[in-house]
Amino acid sequence: MRRVHTGRALGFAATVACVMAAVLPRAQAFSFRSDSGDWAGSWDTTIGYGMGWRVSNPDCRLIAIANGGCGYSPNIDDGDLNYLHKTEYTKALTGVTELQLKYKEQFGAFVRASGLYDFSVMGNDVDRTPLSHEAKGVVGSYTRLLDAFGFLRFDLGSLPSELRVGRQVVSWGESTFIPGGLNSVDYFDVTALQVPGAELKQALLPDSMVVFNSQLSKNLSTQLLYLWSWHPDILEPTGAYFSTNDVAGAGSNQRVVLGFGAVSDMGVDFSPLGGGLVKDFQTIPRLPDHRPPESGQYGINFKYYLPNFGQGTQLGFYFLNYTSRVPVVSLQTGTPAGLGNAYGAVNSVAAAAQALAAGNSFSSAVQIGTAAGQQAAAATGGNLTAATAQQYATIGANTLLAGGNVNAQAANLATSEYSRTQGFYEEFPQDIKMFGLSFNSQLQSTGTAIQGEVAYRHDVPLQIDDVELIYASLTPFETGLANLLHEPVTGPGHCVPNSATPITGCNQLGSYYKTDAQGRLISQTVKGYALKDTYHFDLTATQVFANVFKASQAVLIFEAGADYVPGLEDKLSGGPQGFGLRFDGPGTNLSGNPNLGGYPEFPAVGGQCVASSVPNPHGQCLEPGAAFATTWAWGYVIAGRLEYNNAIGDWNLLPHFTWQQDVTGVSPGPGGAFRAGRIAATMGLTASVRNMLELDVSFTTYGGAGQYNLLNDRDFVAASVKFSF
């Protein structure tokens, strides 16, 4: 199950490009003023058209084995499969317009709206799975009201103050590119940044709040805010070009597919065994999300200016109580009916195969298996239909005739029956408390602008490895079925890999098997996260140069960031069972548990594990410990631009580049910023004339970190034109 690594970190390269574009001069807005001069306003509009093309071949490690690749998950590959042969992924018309009206600088209002229509998306121009109506509403066609607030400026005693009420964006801190810092007030649309020619203000989405600003003294100011609405971040929808999550985004498949890549999200065709297509084979369905209340978010900051420190230095102090905008995932164990039907499936397969082996005719063996399955299910709380029991009996008999493993087939079908009665859901924990410090200044000797911040968060929900969550959610099935089959049960914490209950004994979270007084299974919640304290550090330097490569001006920005999570449990010996506690990292589609690996056993493709995976003592593939979240993780971004004014007539030419590298460690999810070895680079050229017309063409490439870089094969070329008036 891959969930949230399509969050703020995904749009990293696009964010850099948008920020670099934001510092370009823009056209003067249409301004107006009343005859008296009391009323004044401005209206600014930008219309853009952009196209993007895929220019790299798909990486088989990011496509499930059952879908034609060599990867271990069918829950991340819809975006890849939709553009296997189709190179054009977007052809979008965009618009942003904003209107400001004010009276004597005392009060006024500001409104901003945006819109998008992507001809490629709306034309269902994909190779495999057309985007759903919900997904198209995110990346295909929409109009949005962004900011819409009123403001009042007044003196509170002798203190100049301002009150703003309504939908608005509040930016905190000093981070330029790297996410995870102090700028956590508003929510974010990752998809908006992937549109060629997009502007950052299209991705920073406002929430409804009241904001009070006041100048407490010559050098000290404060800001207080209270939010009365909440929205989650908008992630890439399932099937879009940049999507790496088929489970949780808009238009998702609404289910997690088990089987470590051996099972397709399109289902399993048992026709060769007489069973037909089973679309929901070994899937866990999605339950309704646990959405938080709208209220309960508030914060305050203070800014203090030191005029004599350097060339002037501003310090910032922050506090924010907020609700997570990126989801964590928890699971629900299955029902008594699911366990009963699983027992019925085992009996259908086994009885049919045994009857056939005993000399019965094929039709007679199927009848025996059908009856045995229904009786077993009914006796244990199940409701297996005659048609399903007959299907399983047919599969069991044909598996025997084909020389297959009847016991493994029975286990597969039983797992499928139980998993259908499970569930997973997203939740957004509340009352995360963030404390922060920031500074910005300028070095006297070189004129270099420097800025930095540190953000400390208390009770941050960190996502536990999803494979371990699934293992834990299957413990009632494993233990319950073993009891029904009168097999010995190994309890939690007593790891015997070759026993009847290896998951129960060896998984890192223990057993969730629980029954009532009548012995019926009780459904349990497998909490998908742990609350931890975290630190995020950020430092940025910006230098402007003259006469570089004959350019009018050159700008170079360097930003480094780091995440620190003290107290993470040992990955192999920590946690509640002493078998480790691993927090999720991107692309960890297998277990990191050396006692389980790819259980149910899934051997390596062609006898070899996919690169970076390693075999465990039982011949299965598993993830190395370095693939999961680490205590420290850090990376950096370098961005630069040359400016050639009037290079060709009135046209200005601006070559630009960005380089992003995650150096060491893995930031914990959801939405972790860093994954060691991951890189992204962009080179482009912008041409503008009279600050009204702008053309841009760029090439972006992703690399490093192997299958743990979920965008490793999404290199693209983008071109856009924008007209501002």
Where are these regions (language model features)?
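Short loop/turn motifs that connect adjacent beta-strands in outer-membrane beta-barrel proteins
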Residues: A27-W43, S56-P58, L99-A109, F151-L163, ...
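Transmembrane beta-strands of outer-membrane beta-barrel pores
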Residues: Y49-V55, G115-F119, R167-S171, Y226-P232, ...
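Flexible, surface-exposed loop regions and adjacent strand-edge segments
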Residues: C60-A66, V126-S132, P179-D186, S229-W230, ...
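Outer membrane beta-barrel
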Residues: E105-V256, G635-V637, H656-T658, T664-G665, ...
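Outer-membrane beta-barrel "beta-signal"
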Residues: D713-F725
